[in-house]
Regions:
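Charged/polar positions within long, soluble alpha-helices
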Residues: 70, 74, 104, 137-140
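N-terminal low-complexity, intrinsically disordered segments
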Residues: 1-60
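Mixed-charge, glycine-accented linear interaction segment located at domain edges/termini
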Residues: 110-176
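Compact, well-ordered interaction domains used in eukaryotic information-processing assemblies
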Residues: 52-84
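Low-complexity, intrinsically disordered tandem-repeat tracts enriched in small/polar residues
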Residues: 184-189
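An exposed acidic His-Trp-rich patch
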Residues: 76-124
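Generic structural signal for well-ordered, non-transmembrane alpha-helical segments
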Residues: 63, 97-100, 126-133
Length: 190
């Protein structure tokens, strides 16, 4: 099971909510969500691997996840997205029908926070689309005029593309003839 849960506590912050509700005209068009800080839950098999990481710009995190999803759908060998402060990055590497997740903190000393997690590619893509749709719905609940913002329009377009994208067939892992096989055993001889 895999789920992305964009934080929603920002909606209860009077500063964010009143500022968003008052946006109009050119300010709506220029809205990019950069001031909205919240957490992003990343749930793998019932465990939130991002628990305790902290708040970061929510719209930026969701945007980067959607872009990473588009890169993977286009056959890129890897993608990454900011998922927390520091920055904390989620690295995504296709492995057949799955995607290998590694979460790293680049705050010195850089370290791996979670790794070796395989997630079904289609579930990952659905979770990315769902997270983006939830953030847009929450924004529009506060100010429906935000529908006209460049950011919301671009993200909506990207979500449509991601949800419809035919995934480029993933290469088998490890690639045939790879000298990187290291710890990958194809068979065990007795």
């Amino acid at each position: 099971v895999f789920n992305l849960r964009p934080g929603r506590s920002w909606r209860h912050n009077p500063s964010y909510a009143s500022e968003l509700a008052r946006l109009e005209g050119d300010a709506v068009r220029k809205f990019d969500g950069a001031r909205i800080l919240d957490v992003l839950g990343i749930e793998v098999d019932g465990v939130d691997i991002a628990a305790g990481i902290g708040e970061a710009p929510l719209c930026e995190m969701v945007d980067e996840l959607i872009q990473a999803g588009l890169f993977l759908a286009n056959g890129d060998p890897a993608a990454q997205a900011t998922v927390g402060p520091g920055p904390t990055q989620l690295v995504l590497e296709p492995r057949g029908e799955d995607v290998l997740l590694t979460m790293i903190s680049l705050r010195p000393p850089a370290r791996i926070l979670a790794g070796g997690l395989l997630v079904d590619r289609q579930r990952l893509r659905k979770a990315m689309v769902g997270a983006g749709q939830r953030v847009i719905t929450d924004l529009l609940d506060v100010n429906a005029d935000l529908r006209a913002s460049d950011w919301v329009q671009r993200i909506t377009r990207d979500l449509r593309q991601l949800s419809r994208a035919a995934t480029v067939p993933a290469q088998p892992w490890p690639p045939e003839g790879s000298k990187q096989a290291g710890f990958v055993a194809k068979s065990v001889a007795k």
